[in-house]
Amino acid sequence: MLTRSKKYGGRIWLNDIDSRMAVHQASINLQGPAAMPTTDAIGEQVIEAVVAGPDGANRLFTIIGAANVCIEATRQQRTTETWTFLVGPPLTRLQFHRAIGTASIASQIVSVQTAPREFTVNIHSVEADWDDENQRVKVRVEIGVIANGTTVTVTQIRYSVAILAQM
C-alpha cells in the first residue's frame, strides 16, 4: 500500500496502515581532518509500501530527492570527493534490514577557457547504510571531476534510495 505525506510544523508525516513516523531533513556533522563533506537532502519524497520481505522485513521505503554539493576542477585538474547526507525515517538497528541507492548529476556549470577543451564528470560510487549515531540511513556519493581547458563545478545531485525495514 502506498502512502501520502502531509507537512506539519516542518516535518513530513507518513500515514500508512499501522504507523506514523516523522521524516525530517538533517545533516551529519563529521569532525576531524579526514571528514567528508556533508550536505542536507532537499525536496525529499518518501513512499512507504507494505511488503513480505526476507527475515521479517515488512516495509519498503522508496526515497527520492536532491542534495546540493560543490565540487570543482579547473584547467588541468582532477578532483574526487565523497559527499554524505541522511535520508528516510528514523529506524533502530533492529528495524533496518538493508538499503541501496543510486545517484546522478543534476546540475553542473562549465566555463570554457583554453584549447583543448574537455571535461568529465562521474559518479564513482553510491553507498547507503544505516548510521547508528543518527538512527537513519546515511548515503555516501563519490563524485569525480576532470577538467582540461575548462572550469567545471558540480552543484547538485539527484538520488534514489530504497530501504527495507521491519516495522
Tell me the role of every PLM-derived stretch:
Residues 2-167:
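Extracellular attachment/recognition segments
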